[in-house]
């Protein structure tokens, strides 16, 4: 997929030095976001120091419904460049309700290896996960979690034990509570 002219223009607008113009651009993205623009938003989130822009970007990322953005989120979460906004990016994953089931190992690694706040957000993604996951993957991840339990802090042990309780029961279809 190549980047279209409109997306190039939006990405360019996100690099403006005018905060109001950036906020207007973010509002326009709600109607026409694609994976290239999501990557630009993640860059903006990482680079800006302006709270109102961070809030606007996070609101948009947490409302995304474009499944093409899932690999963009995963790539950013795994990139050390974005370590400073990793917690927020992981939170957006459970908030936007997109399907991350094929990335179960990524989120389990986050629970195991990251500081508690990121680990908690990753746990929440797994808790809200749905879709078919191969038994071999689940079995491999359970072994990883059990290994991590041997030298986990009390807080991490709580999350890891929680994973052991839920990972076998990830539903194949999204469940809606009334």
Model-derived segments and their meaning:
Residues 15, 147-150, 154, 168, ...:
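Generic surface-pattern signal
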Residues 17-18, 49-50, 81-82, 114-115, ...:
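Short inter-helical turns and helix N-cap capping residues of alpha-solenoid HEAT/ARM repeat scaffolds
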Residues 15, 49, 63-66, 81-87:
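Short linear motifs at secondary-structure transitions and domain/linker junctions
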Residues 1, 21-33, 43, 54-66, ...:
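Structural detector for internal amphipathic alpha-helices that build alpha-solenoid repeat scaffolds
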Residues 1-13, 32-46, 66-79, 98-112, ...:
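Amphipathic alpha-helical scaffolding segments comprising HEAT/armadillo-like alpha-solenoid repeats
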Residues 106-158:
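A generic hydrophobic-segment detector
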